[in-house]
């Protein structure tokens, strides 16, 4: 059976559709990509000040996917720069949500790619490959579970265990 198509729905409308069980992320992210409204199936990476693993994930084809990166809210080193964001864009990803900073924000802001992050820091991360992939990550009062769905816009982030249909 073919998977249902995911259609972007504004997060405020999703709250109205889902109701009191809504999973809305409390963390206040900055919209730093050239695309503000994006959605997709969640893939996760948990890493701390090291971006080698997430770079390898974004080199995989994943049309419409969203990579949720938990950098433990460390602002010490950027986890994504223009090269890594470009890899994601070129491999079909809709965007990234980063519990940490990015760098090269001017270039990323001009890409047709969604990018929500806590802020910016020009400092590079290490590249040892440490981290975990496809594990549940939690921040902002929400569990981000691989295979579930994320909807992002200027109002925030909503996560759902199933595709939500517009009403």
Curated annotation (Swiss-Prot):
CDD domains: RraA_family. It is an enzyme of class 4 (lyase). Signal peptide: none annotated. It catalyses: 4-hydroxy-4-methyl-2-oxoglutarate = 2 pyruvate; oxaloacetate + H(+) = pyruvate + CO2. One of its GO terms (biological process) is regulation of RNA metabolic process. Pfam families: RraA-like. Substrate binds at residues 81-84, 103. Its EC number is 4.1.3.17, 4.1.1.112. Its cofactor is a divalent metal cation. One of its GO terms (molecular function) is 4-hydroxy-4-methyl-2-oxoglutarate aldolase activity. InterPro entries: RraA (IPR010203), RraA/RraA-like (IPR005493), RraA/RraA-like_sf (IPR036704). Keywords: Lyase, Metal-binding. Divalent metal cation. Homotrimer. PANTHER family: 4-HYDROXY-4-METHYL-2-OXOGLUTARATE ALDOLASE 3-RELATED. Catalyzes the aldol cleavage of 4-hydroxy-4-methyl-2-oxoglutarate (HMG) into 2 molecules of pyruvate. Also contains a secondary oxaloacetate (OAA) decarboxylase activity due to the common pyruvate enolate transition state formed following C-C bond cleavage in the retro-aldol and decarboxylation reactions. Belongs to the class II aldolase/RraA-like family. This is Putative 4-hydroxy-4-methyl-2-oxoglutarate aldolase.
């Amino acid at each position: 059976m073919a998977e249902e198509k995911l259609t972007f729905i504004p997060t405020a409308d999703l709250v109205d559709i889902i109701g009191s069980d809504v999973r809305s992320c409390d963390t206040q992210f900055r919209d730093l990509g050239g695309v503000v409204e994006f959605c997709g199936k969640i893939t996760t990476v948990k890493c701390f000040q090291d971006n080698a693993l997430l770079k390898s994930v974004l080199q995989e084809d994943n049309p419409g996917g969203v990579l949720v990166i938990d950098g433990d809210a460390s602002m010490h080193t950027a986890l994504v720069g223009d090269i890594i964001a470009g890899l994601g864009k070129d491999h079909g990803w809709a965007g990234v949500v980063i519990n940490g900073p990015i760098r090269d924000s001017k270039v990323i802001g001009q890409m047709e790619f969604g990018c929500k992050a806590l802020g910016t820091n020009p400092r590079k991360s290490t590249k040892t490959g440490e981290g975990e992939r496809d594990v549940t990550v939690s921040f902002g009062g929400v569990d981000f579970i691989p295979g579930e769905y994320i909807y992002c816009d200027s109002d925030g982030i909503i996560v759902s265990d199933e595709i939500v249909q517009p009403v």
